[in-house]
Structures are given as structure tokens and as C-alpha cells.
Amino acid sequence: SEQFGSQQVSRNYHLRGRILQVPSNYNPQTRQYSGIWDGTFKPAYSNNPAWCLWDMLTHPRYGMGKRLGAADVDKWALYVIGQYCDQSVPDGFGGTEPRITCNAYLTTQRKAWDVLSDFCSAMRCMPVWNGQTLTFVQDRPSDKVWTYNRSNVVMPDDGAPFRYSFSALKDRHNAVEVNWIDPNNGWETATELV
């Protein structure tokens, strides 16, 4: 206090975040999954959005754990999503980075479904209640399920097997402005044109 006199001291902290429950065969530092997962968890720091979501859904104090139990959430779907999020992709500077990370902090109380939807949209997935559990469907590359062609399509009376319609060109977006918290700029909000 003698160094600063009567000046107001400003403090900044660089926090890693919470210790979460992650799969027992997962190494968060290397982002590697070894062997077959037995469905058990271990505590570790992770910024993988799938395990941040698991924490939010099952934690009884600040999450939805008082309403949802671990058996009510499809951990196997989150495991596959977590692996996809951890895949290395080019970072644009000659290196690689994980495909999707989560460095969020929640500061206001909101409806649970809104927070759940926001978490899911960050990793390109949707929450789905299948009648027994809360599961997740992610938009990611996968094998084709069915090929449609003239031999397996019912023809209408006019003989045209397919009718195509598209949105107007003026209604299609080809760029979007994204706001994000930039750790390289003092954690200030930055806008990026993508």
C-alpha cells in the first residue's frame, strides 16, 4: 500500500477455471483418450465444452444436478462430442489448436434451457430429450445414411421426381461479425468478421 499511496489499485487475474469431472481415460493436457472408456470420471481441469456442459448439467450447487442426475444425461453422446471438440485443426498461424474450446463464465442467473442451448450451440449440437435421457446431436461430418435417386423415390403425377427451391441470393449470408473475449488483448471484447 505504501507503493501506491492513495491510488486505487487495479488487479487482473488469469484463471484457468474449474476442476471438472472428465472421463477416466482422458488426459486434458494432451487432449488424448486412451483405451476404452468404462463410463467413470476423474477430477481435472478442462476447457472441453462437452465436459463443461456435463459439469453444468450434473453439479448440484450451481448446475442442474438437483433436477437431473448423472443417469438422466447421455454421457456416451457427450464422450463422442468431446472427442470431436478435441481434434486438432489448423490455427491459421502454422500451428494447431483444439477444434472447439469453452472458456465461459456465467455471471447472471438465466433460464436453464437458455444456458443449455447456448452451451450446445457453441459446440454445434442440439439437446434432445429422447423420453429417458437428455442426449445430444452434433452437426459434424459422418457417413451417409441413405442415397436418394430415381429408383427409390416415389414419382408424382407430373413425372418430376425432385423439386428444388432455394432462398433468394440477397437473403443468404456470406459473412458474420462474431464478438468474443480476446485473451491476448486484456480479455476485452473483440469483433471478428468471419
Regions found by a protein language model. Name each.
Residues 132-135:
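Hydrophobic residues embedded in beta-strands of well-ordered beta-sheets
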